Amino acid sequence: MAREQDWIAGEVKFRDEFLRPAEVGVLWPAIDPSVWPSEETEHEREVWERFEHKPMGSYLLTVGRACYMKGSKEAVQVAAAASLPLVHVGGGETEEMQRQAEKFGAELLIMPRIDEIEIAALMRNAHALIATARTEGFGLTPMEAAMVGTPALVVDDCGFTHTITDGLNGRRLPWPNTEEGLREWTEAIQQAGESANRTAWSKAGRERILSRFSANHQAEGLARSLAAMGVKVEISDLEILPGLDPA
């Protein structure tokens, strides 16, 4: 008696003429709202109060392993142009960032390894998150920033176009490699300090995330892909909106 097929990845009948898995599209990343609550929890407040690496005053934040792809040097230039300290979380080629900071007269704070709640607190208390990565596949940090009420300022490139609509839930900006580009970044950083913008951008950002990028949406997307390949799996009528920027 033939065994019921319970693994389909290697089965030719589930592949197209080029032997690629059939019916496979984009499975969007997801955000856990409990990790990024809209309001500061008591635990987060206590963590922030005793956080020994807490910056003094307003600061910009960048998250991710420092490297060319992440645009870490460009982030330093933006901070220098805005005359605000840059806090970096994620390690990587931080010596290059330090040299860039010395070159442009920027204040750079390199965080040691910190835990998730400390990152959330750093994110919530930042003036703005800046993301200058090249060819970013998706980009979770702008979503995380929006969830905790911090403006996300990103380059108008690749994955960031899936999550940020310029002027609606953050700012999408040109590369900061020209005088005009840097001017637009400094103006956006000023806008990020206005309470009306912070409130409106965060509200729109949370709405987009919860309507497109929740764990339920990710699970449903996976279930529907499996169902399309003939796997017996329960699916629901959850509305899955396109991930791409509707603008």
Where are these regions (language model features)?
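Glycosyltransferase donor-sugar binding loop
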Residues: 31, 63-66, 83-98, 112-113
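Short hydrophobic beta-strand element within catalytic cores of glycosyltransferases
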Residues: 151-155, 164
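Aromatic "clamp/platform" in nucleotide-sugar-dependent glycosyltransferases that forms part
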Residues: 134
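Short alpha-helical donor nucleotide-sugar binding micro-motif in glycosyltransferases
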Residues: 113, 121-126
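A short, active-site helix/loop in glycosyltransferases that binds the activated sugar's phosphate group
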Residues: 1-26, 31-41
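Nucleotide-activated donor-binding/catalytic signature segment of Leloir-type glycosyltransferases, i.e.
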Residues: 97-117
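Conserved donor-binding/catalytic core segment of Leloir-type glycosyltransferases
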Residues: 50-70, 76-81, 87
